[in-house]
């Protein structure tokens, strides 16, 4: 079992006043059914979740459960229940604890996610402002433009209302904001889900637009799009399981640029390990003086980074700074019918779980160690290494960035990562079926805990290189320019 903290094996998550604005077309769930679901959720999380009390005391967490129970004490539409559940799960402050878009029932998924309610362009949030990255054919909408308001609601207000529903570890709000970017990398976008549920619109929207180039203001009317249309805008063919996901290019001077936009390759039939093997052979043949690994936009998935680190080290690399912990040895029989997973070994850790105290067990991986080392592998790359990072990096990519920086294997360039130095939860999952409402909540099973006190933050790059609206307007990649400048000094 790998140490990466993938959101699922299958693929890939206010105010009550906002919730009541939802339409009545959604399925209704009676209070009696919701009370059963919240009791199940409470028992499962209090028994199995390793990070439940990382950022909340037991008393605080009990209060969160009580507030969810109160919200569900009256019947709700499934959309209202989904919002209440998502708001509750966000309070756990775990980047892998959410009502996973891809693990909902078909009926719930169709009802909640498939409507014609999505903005038709791509954008990212920069300094609290919605900045267009690609107009996607919307007339009079250009890269770098700011959407200052939608149907009269300011961009700042939209961001403020959506953030409480987004997932991230601890107080790493940069990750929460990054979750709300729409840049063509996700099959279902977090922004699309919560904006549609909280701010329902007719099939067109009025966009208040401000030009980054000259400050001119204008109003643009744009039609909303469906989930199918959103997926057609994606950067890669998501249905081709054989497509290469990584790419290798060489800049002048044979500087290698390894772009890795996604490590969620669980169902991929592409030989990604073979690609990395061949990439390092090419670097060796070309005697590349530097390697730039571009992880921007990559949340994580498999431990693909271990295959890269294996070529950067001359001896096996120990990962002793963090300890893996679980809350149980064997799952209670009464919970098993509600716990789906891809690997039933997660139901019984056996002798691999060694009691630490009344709350935790240490989970052993290899030779009595909590984490197996990364084994050195040739050919070793001896040149300069630069890794481009941003707030999306919150799971396996966060761990990779942390290992690279902590072991001085390379220079991190870009923006602070997601994840959290206080540890994250994942590695193995149950998909908790709340059968009465037809909703699901992801339940991570393995928590990593640092051996020494750490800040409540992601990894801060060695060199900060932030994207700006002007960069987007002009097509400039300032982070890559910075990385190439560092590489040129190799």
Question: Predicted regions: what is each one?
Answer:
Residues 25-327, 332-341, 421-434, 440, ...:
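Flexible, low-complexity junctional segments that flank or bridge functional domains
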């Amino acid at each position: 079992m790998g140490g990466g903290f993938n959101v699922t094996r299958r693929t890939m998550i206010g105010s009550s006043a906002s919730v009541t604005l939802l339409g009545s077309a959604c399925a209704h769930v009676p209070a009696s059914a919701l009370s059963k679901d919240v009791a199940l959720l409470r028992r499962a999380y209090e028994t199995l979740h390793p990070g439940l009390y990382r950022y909340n005391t037991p008393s605080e967490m009990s209060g969160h459960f009580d507030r969810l129970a109160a919200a569900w004490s009256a019947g709700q539409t499934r959309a209202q229940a989904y919002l209440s559940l998502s708001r509750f799960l966000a309070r756990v402050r775990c980047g892998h604890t959410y009502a996973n878009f891809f693990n909902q029932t078909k009926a719930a998924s169709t009802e909640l996610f498939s409507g014609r309610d999505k903005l038709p362009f791509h954008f990212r949030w920069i300094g609290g402002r919605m900045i267009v990255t690609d107009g996607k054919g919307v007339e009079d909408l250009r890269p770098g433009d700011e959407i200052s308001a939608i149907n009269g609601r300011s961009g700042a207000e939209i961001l403020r209302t959506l953030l409480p529903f987004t997932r991230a570890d601890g107080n790493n709000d940069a990750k929460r904001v990054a979750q709300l970017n729409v840049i063509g990398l996700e099959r279902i976008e977090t922004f699309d889900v919560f904006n549609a549920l909280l701010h329902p619109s007719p099939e067109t929207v009025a966009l208040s637009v401000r030009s980054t180039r000259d400050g001119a203001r204008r109003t643009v009317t744009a039609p909303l799009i469906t989930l199918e249309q959103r997926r057609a805008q994606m950067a890669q063919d998501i249905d081709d399981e054989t497509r290469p996901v990584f790419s290798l290019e060489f800049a002048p001077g044979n500087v290698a640029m390894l772009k890795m936009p996604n490590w969620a390759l669980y169902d991929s039939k592409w030989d990604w390990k073979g690609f990395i093997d061949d990439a390092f052979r090419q670097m060796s043949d070309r005697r590349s003086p530097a390697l730039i690994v571009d992880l921007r936009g990559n949340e994580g998935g498999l431990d693909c980074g271990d295959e890269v680190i294996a070529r950067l080290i001359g001896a096996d690399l120990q990962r002793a700074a963090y300890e893996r912990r679980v809350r149980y040895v064997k799952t209670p029989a009464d919970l098993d019918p509600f716990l789906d997973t891809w690997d039933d070994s997660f139901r019984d850790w056996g002798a691999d779980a060694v009691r630490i105290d009344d709350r935790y067990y240490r989970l052993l991986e290899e030779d009595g160690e909590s984490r197996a080392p990364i084994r050195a592998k040739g050919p070793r790359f001896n040149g300069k290494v630069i890794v481009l990072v941003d707030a999306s990096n919150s799971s396996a990519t966060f761990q990779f960035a942390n290992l690279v920086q902590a072991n001085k294997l390379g220079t991190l360039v870009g923006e602070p990562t997601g994840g959290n130095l206080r540890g994250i939860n994942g590695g193995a999952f149950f998909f908790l079926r709340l059968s009465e409402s037809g909703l699901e909540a992801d339940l991570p099973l393995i928590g990593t805990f640092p051996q020494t006190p750490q800040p409540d933050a992601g990894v801060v790059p060695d060199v900060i290189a932030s994207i700006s609206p002007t960069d987007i307007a002009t097509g400039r990649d300032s982070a890559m320019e910075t990385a190439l400048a560092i590489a040129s000094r190799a």
